[in-house]
């Protein structure tokens, strides 16, 4: 069993061992306190213009055009090399502190759901600003304030927090792979599940044989990665290697990238543990007194800074030149034999057995003092693990290979959550990488509105049904994740492995649709005398739009679904199957698709999916109702299809769900299904899942459903469905972005 108390008292990579915050028990009760299992829709209503102090038409990309990036870089270098008395720089250089800040901002990214990362500047807000692993990074951000003040909205906090670390490496002699700006700020914290624990450094996220719960990547609450003293504070390098491999894999890093990142990260800087945190270190920023003005971890030991700093229970530097890029980390790791020791704070770390290592490392604040190098348990993992060891030795023998591997892995770490390369800004954007899911540029003339109308008629006359067209377009577009901006219809990767074989996409049905659409594509492109072409990606979306128009026509509404050509088709060689599989939905409530092994309830999975698709609660509501009427359920199930006219875009889902003549009960045959019983006849009228019934049971969702169920809600339902559908179809179309809230789209008349 993990000794949590011991872990809390001494452990982290750069986190103080401090007590967990004490909950305030006298605060007013919220609905969540009374009904903890209630579906919380607030996650769908964050980051609106109501929380943003900037004008609604503010466009960060436009503001960035006025930024002198070279001047900003020089200002950063000047700042890094000018030590300030209120928080002295180790070795006279803040570079390592800024690298840790950037690393910890980006390093919260997890590949399972794309959440975390540095793309929004979330390190400024709770809980991340007060995580024990982020201790004293409040000072790093405060050091940056004069530059943020100087450049204003031309550079976002999100970009500045990441760029500072990149510049820091360059200032210490390392040639980085490049850098992309383009991270707009948000103004409130993201509501993310960081783990089940209610204490700092708790590790209730494990079960069985140290199996880490999904989607989590870090090993303990409040750590960015792993415990540097080893699992649960146990200084076992091989056991630590297992944690490292699992955690970094869940951050989308392979073994070589992992070794390079750890080596490169520990080539500069030092850890801080001049004394035990208990009795010396104060509250984190969110709990600190108001007069501290957002700074936390006030230290009463000695001067409280410099040589007396307490950030971790660990103390010491890894290399002989802690502000210079070199191969010193690996040289020391392999040169010396290491023995277990403790820091002044009592943390478990390692020192050389070799006496010649004494006095080889300069003191961070006193020229007359010297030290021996220090290694952490997780550092020794790189030497002792049978997989990491040979990689580290190769890097030791070939420093140029380390530099290349670290440059690319560092770039990947900083940009993993930014999505396609087209979102990057600035002059230092390198060539496309496979992990960016590259999509070819448009190299042909796009179809006209007349072509679009003709193609829609051809699609609707091809024998493909409305449900088939809707399901295919939705499967392509709704693979998008607003967290790390991956997925979407652009690229037509739904026709490629692994997406074409996902159970959620019904492979045999999908193959039929794709074959028909490819035939239409070939016929159209082959008939053009000029350079005009239509991509399969565009046809997939256009087919869905045509199907929506046809279903609306059947309901008596002559509507036009916006469509903007310009998507292109990616190749299998441009698709990394190993990292693309994480986009496969565990469940898709919009199509009433769920897996038995899913730990989340259908209604919770619905909320999670809506959050990934950047939908509001009204948009989520109207899409579910519309998808049911379009008969787009997975496996053509009838659950939630409350109509005798499937394929017609009517508001009957809401009308019949809210019909007080129907009583609902759990099905005896299937516990995941509910039966709607006619109160008069006792006969079964409908079947549904929890993802359907939640719109009648949840008070907020019922209020939304009532709007569309009203007699005057029919046209509103169709109009709002089309708007929400268009949003989903274009979530990945960054080429269409005008202002922050606007998109340009070519509209076409319905058939």
UniProtKB/Swiss-Prot annotation:
Catalytic activity of the protein: H2O2 + AH2 = A + 2 H2O; 2 H2O2 = O2 + 2 H2O
Gene Ontology biological-process entries: cellular response to hydrogen peroxide; hydrogen peroxide catabolic process
Annotated segments matching region Disordered: 1-31, 345-375
Tryptophyl-tyrosyl-methioninium (Trp-Tyr) (with M-251) crosslink location in chain: 103-225
Cross-link (Tryptophyl-tyrosyl-methioninium (Tyr-Met) (with W-103)): 225-251
Family the entry assigns: Belongs to the peroxidase family. Peroxidase/catalase subfamily.
Protein role: Bifunctional enzyme with both catalase and broad-spectrum peroxidase activity.
UniProt name for this protein: Catalase-peroxidase 1
Lineage: Bacteria, Pseudomonadati, Pseudomonadota, Betaproteobacteria, Burkholderiales
């Amino acid at each position: 069993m993990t000794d949590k108390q011991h872990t809390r008292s001494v452990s982290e990579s750069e986190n103080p061992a401090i007590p967990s915050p004490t909950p305030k028990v006298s605060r007013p009760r919220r609905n969540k306190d009374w009904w903890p299992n209630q579906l919380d829709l607030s996650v769908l209503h964050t980051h609106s213009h109501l929380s943003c102090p900037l004008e609604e038409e503010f466009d960060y990309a436009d503001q960035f055009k006025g930024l002198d990036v070279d001047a900003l870089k020089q200002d950063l270098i000047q700042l890094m090399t000018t030590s300030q008395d209120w928080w002295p720089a180790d070795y006279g250089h803040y570079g390592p502190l800024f690298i840790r800040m950037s690393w910890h901002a980006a390093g919260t990214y997890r590949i399972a759901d794309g959440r975390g990362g540095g793309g929004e500047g979330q390190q400024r807000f709770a809980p991340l600003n007060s995580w024990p692993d982020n201790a004293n990074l409040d000072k790093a951000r405060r050091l940056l304030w004069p530059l943020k003040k100087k450049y204003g909205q031309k550079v976002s906090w999100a970009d500045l927090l990441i760029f500072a670390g990149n510049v820091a490496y360059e200032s210490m002699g390392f040639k980085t792979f490049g850098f992309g700006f383009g991270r707009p700020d948000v103004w409130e914290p993201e509501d993310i599940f960081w783990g089940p624990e209610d204490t700092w450094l708790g590790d209730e996220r494990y079960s069985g044989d140290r199996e880490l719960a999904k989607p989590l990547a870090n090993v303990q609450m409040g750590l960015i990665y792993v415990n540097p003293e080893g699992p649960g504070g146990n200084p076992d390098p091989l056991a630590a290697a297992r944690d490292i491999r699992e955690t970094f894999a869940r951050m989308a890093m392979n073994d070589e990238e992992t070794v390079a990142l750890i080596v490169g990260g520990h080539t500069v800087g030092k850890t801080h543990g001049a004394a035990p945190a208990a009795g010396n270190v104060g509250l984190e920023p969110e709990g600190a007194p108001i007069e501290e003005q957002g700074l936390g971890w006030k230290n009463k030991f000695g001067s409280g800074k410099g040589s007396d700093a307490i950030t971790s229970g660990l103390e010491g530097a890894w290399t002989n030149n802690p502000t210079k890029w070199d191969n010193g980390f690996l040289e020391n790791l392999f040169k010396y034999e290491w023995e277990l020791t403790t820091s002044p704070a009592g943390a478990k770390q390692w020192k050389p057995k070799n006496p010649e290592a004494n006095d080889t490392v300069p003191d961070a604040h006193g020229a007359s003092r010297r030290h021996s190098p220090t290694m952490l348990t997780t550092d020794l993992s790189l030497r002792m693990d049978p997989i990491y060891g040979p990689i580290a030795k190769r890097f030791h023998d070939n420093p140029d290979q380390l530099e290349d591997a670290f440059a690319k892995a560092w770039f990947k770490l900083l940009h993993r959550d930014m999505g396609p390369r087209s979102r990057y800004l600035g002059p230092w954007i390198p060539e496309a990488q496979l992990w960016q899911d590259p999509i070819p540029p448009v190299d042909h003339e796009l179809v006209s509105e007349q072509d679009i109308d003709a193609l829609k008629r051809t699609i609707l006359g091809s024998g493909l049904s409305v449900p088939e067209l809707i399901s295919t377009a939705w499967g392509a577009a709704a693979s998008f994740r607003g967290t790390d901006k991956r997925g979407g219809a652009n690229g037509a990767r739904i026709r490629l492995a692994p997406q074409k074989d996902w159970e959620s996409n019904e492979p045999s049905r999908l193959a039929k649709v794709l074959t028909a659409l490819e035939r239409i594509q070939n016929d159209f492109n082959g008939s053009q005398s000029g350079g005009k072409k239509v991509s399969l990606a565009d046809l997939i979306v256009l087919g869905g739009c045509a199907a929506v128009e046809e279903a609306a026509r059947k309901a008596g509404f002559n509507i036009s679904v916006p469509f903007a050509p310009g998507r292109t088709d990616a190749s299998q060689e441009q698709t990394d199957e190993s990292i693309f599989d994480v986009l496969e939905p565990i469940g898709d409530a919009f199509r009433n698709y769920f897996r038995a092994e899913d730990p989340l309830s259908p209604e919770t999975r619905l909320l999670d999916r809506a959050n990934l698709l950047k939908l509001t609660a009204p948009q989520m509501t109207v899409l579910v109702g519309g998808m049911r009427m379009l008969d787009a359920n997975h496996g053509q199930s009838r659950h939630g299809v409350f109509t005798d006219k499937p394929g017609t875009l009517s508001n009957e889902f809401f009308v019949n769900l809210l019909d007080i003549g129907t009583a609902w009960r759990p099905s005896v045959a299937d516990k995941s299904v509910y039966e709607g019983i006619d109160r008069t006849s006792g006969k079964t009228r409908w079947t549904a899942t929890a993802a359907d019934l939640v719109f009648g049971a949840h008070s907020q969702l019922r209020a939304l459903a009532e709007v569309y169920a009203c007699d005057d809600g029919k046209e509103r339902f169709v109009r709002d469905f089309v708007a929400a559908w268009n949003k989903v179809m274009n979530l990945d179309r960054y080429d269409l972005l005008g202002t922050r809230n606007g998109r340009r789209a070519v509209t076409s008349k319905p058939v």
